[in-house]
Amino acid sequence: GYRMTSQCASGSGQFVENIARYLGVALEDVGRLSLGSDSAEPVSSICAVLAETDVINMVARGVPAPAILRGIHRSIAGRLSKLLRLAGVESPIVVTGGMAADEGLIGALRDQVATGKLGLEIVAPERAVFAGALGAALWGAHRAARVQGDSRKEMLHVHG
């Protein structure tokens, strides 16, 4: 079945993008910086607004950006891991969208899944960013075929 986190937008790519912008870090460097940190600063896992407030306070305290990013990745991975457990999914888990290119998030998710003993393989395809567009195109083709099929049946009924 379909499940999503009920905890605000704190697991979204937009959240990570906002934090990167606030920290003055290029989005393509976020994953590398996160993986390069030996520490992870704890971040609120309740809501994006609270997490952003945490980040503002961390910056004011002089916490290095890589530790903040690693903390954010761990927080997101923790929520995703809980979601995977609740959904009762099977391997492999394919991460799609822009977050699939964030090596820090994928690494944190793999660590979290291993720590939680979920026994799941996490896969992040090279072109995962196109998954949503491909899905939309397939859905559009399906809907167009149904609409055309229905109108043809209706025409046959009216004229036949």
Roles of regions detected by a PLM:
Residues 1-6, 91, 115-125:
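Short beta-alpha connecting loops at secondary-structure transitions
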Residues 1-39, 138, 142:
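Glycine-rich phosphate-binding loop plus the immediately following alpha-helix
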Residues 25-58, 149-152, 156-158:
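Internal, active-site/partner-interface "lid" segment
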Residues 39, 63-64, 88-92, 118-119:
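Short coil/turn connectors at secondary-structure junctions
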Residues 1, 108-117, 143-146:
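A glycine- and small-aliphatic-rich helix-loop capping segment at beta-alpha/alpha-beta transitions
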Residues 13-21, 123-159:
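Glycine-rich phosphate-binding/hydrolytic loop that grips phosphoryl groups
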Residues 85-112, 125-129:
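Glycine-rich phosphate-binding loops at beta-strand->alpha-helix junctions
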Residues 51-83, 129:
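Adenine-nucleotide phosphate-binding core of ATP-dependent small-molecule kinases
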